[in-house]
Amino acid sequence: MSEEVGIILREAVPGDAKDILLMMGQVNKETEFLVLDEAELLLPPETLEEELDYIYESNNNLLLLAIYEGTIIGTASVKADSQFRLSHVGEVGISILQEYWGMGLGTLMLEEIISWAKEMGVLFRLELDVQVRNERAVHLYRKMGFQIRSEERR
């Protein structure tokens, strides 16, 4: 897909902070599946820049950007716990602007995350939380080999 429509996948750097915040604000308006609180959406760019620097220098955290025509259209993240006993487990998250749903971008980004995790060799399990009613995401994760470990009810 990336070659067909000119999408670039690359790791986020501190200079991307403002554009990431804009993209996440847009995604938050487009879907009720994104679980962000007000503080995360109003995060000062300088604070996110510091976090992005930490992620970029880390070997068990990743923020991958999907960029089309200079605009961030999706993010895929892996966040590992800082506690040593849990630092081998990566929590996966994917957000895509609604205009780009159904084009295979989620698959492309998840493949890249899985490849990165194998290459780094420090994460031995990738896991995620997804709402059952988010059928697109559930389908993607099952297609990519993720298994349901538990279901929580409201």
What are these regions (language model features)?
Residues 8-22:
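A short beta-loop-alpha structural element at the N-terminal edge
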Residues 14-15, 25-28, 40-99, 110-112, ...:
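Acetyl-CoA-dependent GNAT
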Residues 32-39:
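A short, aromatic/hydrophobic, helix- or strand-capping loop or linear motif
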Residues 103-108:
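A short glycine-leucine-enriched loop at secondary-structure breakpoints
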Residues 110, 117-129:
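Conserved GNAT acetyl-CoA-binding A-motif
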Residues 141, 146:
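Conserved active-site tyrosine of GNAT-family acetyltransferases
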